[in-house]
Curated annotation (Swiss-Prot):
One of its GO terms (cellular component) is host cell Golgi apparatus. Residues 16-33 have a biased composition (Basic residues). The keyword Transferase does not apply. May participate in nuclear egress of viral particles. Plays a role in the dispersal of several host nucleolar proteins including NCL/nucleolin and NPM1. Since deletion of host NCL/nucleolin negatively impact on nuclear egress, UL24 supposedly acts on this process through its effect on host nucleoli. Induction: Expressed late in the infection cycle. InterPro entries: Herpes_UL24 (IPR002580). It comes from Infectious laryngotracheitis virus (strain Thorne V882) (ILTV). Its main location: virion. Residues 1-33, 254-287 are annotated as: Disordered. It is found in: Virion; Host cytoplasm; Host nucleus, Host nucleolus; Host Golgi apparatus. Keywords: Host cytoplasm, Host Golgi apparatus, Host nucleus, Late protein, Virion. This is Protein UL24 homolog. Pfam families: Herpes_UL24.
């Protein structure tokens, strides 16, 4: 009897264990089924937000260079996005090997060239930037930007031109595409060949677009300035007239005026003038 009771107890314990195992397995499967759609939804929402940000940045740069808007998004991220007489090349999803930064902007002017690496972090809630998820995003974004700057330095062909690499971490709200924060992670200067550097990044990017700044029309102003300078130079080249020259000029002008006002008879010979001066009498006339 005792053995039978023990066997029954063992069977009950085994059945209880199997039931608990099945329940825990069911809960695990249910929790995984619940988590997977949420993770996928978050991932898809982040991808959609990235694509919307790319389109918004291109549209904002078009407003800056072509007019028709204030270009608030572009100026918020890159204050010097419209260089005088320069250009900016925007590249998205640049494959650097171990890292793939979201956006790289090449800003070229007459004096310098900048390579701005942008890592984008999308946020569902924009009330506070000190939450656990945002702090984690900031930490991972900082590591990604440092690796990207190191990979850019390794990929660049050495040259004589200096390129400043500026790393920016941008937090964007998924709703409204508002810029929550822009943080500068690091800044380095490398000596490269600018043409080969551009070709290397262009071949590794999925999408790029170039914006060129138009020169301001200063032709009329330059002409007037040139005319003023030429007039000044002409005044300096011609010496001031002396006193004798001024007197001679006045005398010649006075003589010209007198000759113009004299009658025609005044220019005759002396004999004719004498005959004209003497009175002519007619003998037949009755005085």
């Amino acid at each position: 009897m005792a053995r039978r009771r023990k066997e029954v107890q063992r069977g009950e314990s085994r059945s209880h264990r199997s039931r608990t195992r099945s329940k825990t397995a069911h809960h695990r499967k249910f929790s995984r089924r619940q988590l997977r759609p949420s993770l996928r939804a978050r991932l898809n929402a982040g991808i959609r937000c990235h694509n919307r940000f790319y389109r918004a940045l291109v549209r904002s740069l078009e407003e800056v260079f072509e007019g028709g808007g204030d270009g608030r998004l572009a100026y918020t991220i890159i204050p010097q996005c419209k260089p005088a007489g320069g250009k900016i090349v925007v590249m998205f999803e640049v494959n650097l090997g171990l890292r793939k930064p979201d956006c790289i902007c090449l800003l070229e002017t007459q004096h310098e060239m900048k390579c701005i690496v942008i890592e984008l972090k999308t946020c569902r809630f924009s009330k506070s930037l000190m939450t656990e998820s945002k702090l984690r995003q900031g930490y991972t974004g900082t590591l990604q930007l440092r690796d990207s700057a190191r990979l850019l330095e390794n990929l660049a062909v050495p040259g004589t031109e200096k390129v400043k690499i500026l790393s920016l971490l941008v937090f964007v709200a998924q709703r409204g595409m508002n810029i929550l924060a822009v943080k500068t992670v690091g800044e380095t200067v490398i000596n490269v060949s600018s043409e080969l550097f551009f070709v290397t990044l262009a071949t590794r990017s999925q999408y790029l677009k170039t914006f060129c700044a138009k020169l301001e029309p200063r032709v009329s102003h330059a002409r007037s300035k040139y005319q003023q300078e030429s007039a000044k130079n002409a005044d300096l080249a011609s010496p001031a007239p002396s006193a004798l020259q001024t007197v001679a000029a006045l005398f010649s002008s006075r003589v010209g005026k007198e000759s113009a006002t004299k009658p025609a008879s005044y220019s005759t010979s002396t004999e004719e003038s004498k005959n004209l001066s003497e009175p002519c009498f007619d003998p037949d006339s009755n005085l």
